[in-house]
Amino acid sequence: MSDEQHQNLAIIGHVDHGKSTLVGRLLYETGSVPEHVIEQHKEEAEEKGKGGFEFAYVMDNLAEERERGVTIDIAHQEFSTDTYDFTIVDCPGHRDFVKNMITGASQADNAVLVVAADDGVQPQTQEHVFLARTLGIGELIVAVNKMDLVDYGESEYKQVVEEVKDLLTQVRFDSENAKFIPVSAFEGDNIAEESEHTGWYDGEILLEALNELPAPEPPTDAPLRLPIQDVYTISGIGTVPVGRVETGILNTGDNVSFQPSDVSGEVKTVEMHHEEVPKAEPGDNVGFNVRGVGKDDIRRGDVCGPADDPPSVAETFQAQIVVMQHPSVITEGYTPVFHAHTAQVACTVESIDKKIDPSSGEVAEENPDFIQNGDAAVVTVRPQKPLSIEPSSEIPELGSFAIRDMGQTIAAGKVLGVNER
């Protein structure tokens, strides 16, 4: 990886519209996949009678999924262009993966929306665009994929562009901030070089559009926030919490605090990829050892931050949520599980403060009795156990969450304000 600026890129869109193939193609065209790996995948795919899957295979690290011909792995794949180092927050389309989309898109700076030319806007296309808008993704590149299946027809392309523009208007996403490109990820059209099949199109190709995305605001200005994924005991070192730096910088010698467990100590060592490093920056996955903090003092879901600017712990918080799939209605007192960063905590909806018109963002109703599928609302939430969470306007990386119940994602949201304990 070069010292270029970093972008986290969400790939969103309906299942089977070709997201994995597009990602594989991007990795392939930017030289991020060794040639021999592609050849090997090609042979495997042909053996199994799925000749066209060599790119999707690049994305596919799960042997069992490979057998079923479905790709669902959210691999943090990386590739570089002339301008940026990209990490792909791959967002597969399967319904249960909306939660990953929520946790993924919240880390994403921009997004590529994949829409199949032969299928147009589908329910998940709508859901993903709505989420992208709710979670604050600023720029959208719309890849109208599978152009080879409609014989590269301009009228088919234009029809899909109109459908997507209507959808963007519905969710108040400024289509001025969207670029539309006719592509075939499978054949490679308009990805890394202009296609001879789309003579009627004179816009940018995908890699050019990616190069021109606006640079993300560097999150290092924010204080250190590092959600803990696991806590290990390693002989000779002691207790080693592991997690990804979301904001700020973790330095050896720092005094840090873990919330909500409320323990603190001095960072003795920081390790990344089995090597000791003096510091860790946003996006780095690290293990570190803190003097005086034992294995039973901290747990997954804690957030590490500076001792003099510790992570917020919410007594209650106000949030804007979007209800995606709930079998009936949500009323005050509803207590599902909130998934925020690495924490999973049951939380009660204490009050439904406002219903929001999702298409305009205006207040549709004050203090409604209930909300249901498709509604956006501002709610006040009380965690049943201590939860560290931050307003998304201050630290967006720790300000979004998914709400799950009955084995599915019910809603997604972002934190507006925290009333601290």
Swiss-Prot record:
G4: annotated span: 145-148
Region (G5): 184-186
InterPro entries named among the record's database cross-references: EFTu-like_2, G_TR_CS, GTP-eEF1A_C, P-loop_NTPase, Small_GTP-bd, T_Tr_GTP-bd_dom, TRAFAC_GTPase_members, Transl_B-barrel_sf
PROSITE patterns: G_TR_1, G_TR_2
Entry annotated with the keyword Protein biosynthesis: yes
Cellular localization per UniProt: Cytoplasm
Reactions the enzyme catalyzes: GTP + H2O = GDP + phosphate + H(+)
Span list, region G1: 13-20
Short name of any one Pfam family annotated for the protein: GTP_EFTU
GO cellular component: cytoplasm
Keywords from the named record: Cytoplasm, Elongation factor, GTP-binding, Hydrolase, Magnesium, Metal-binding, Nucleotide-binding, Protein biosynthesis
GO molecular function, a single term: GTP binding
Region spans: G3: 90-93
Binding site for Mg(2+): 20
Family: Belongs to the TRAFAC class translation factor GTPase superfamily. Classic translation factor GTPase family. EF-Tu/EF-1A subfamily.
HAMAP family: EF_Tu_A (MF_00118_A)
Role of this protein: GTP hydrolase that promotes the GTP-dependent binding of aminoacyl-tRNA to the A-site of ribosomes during protein biosynthesis.
Name of the protein described by the UniProt record: Elongation factor 1-alpha
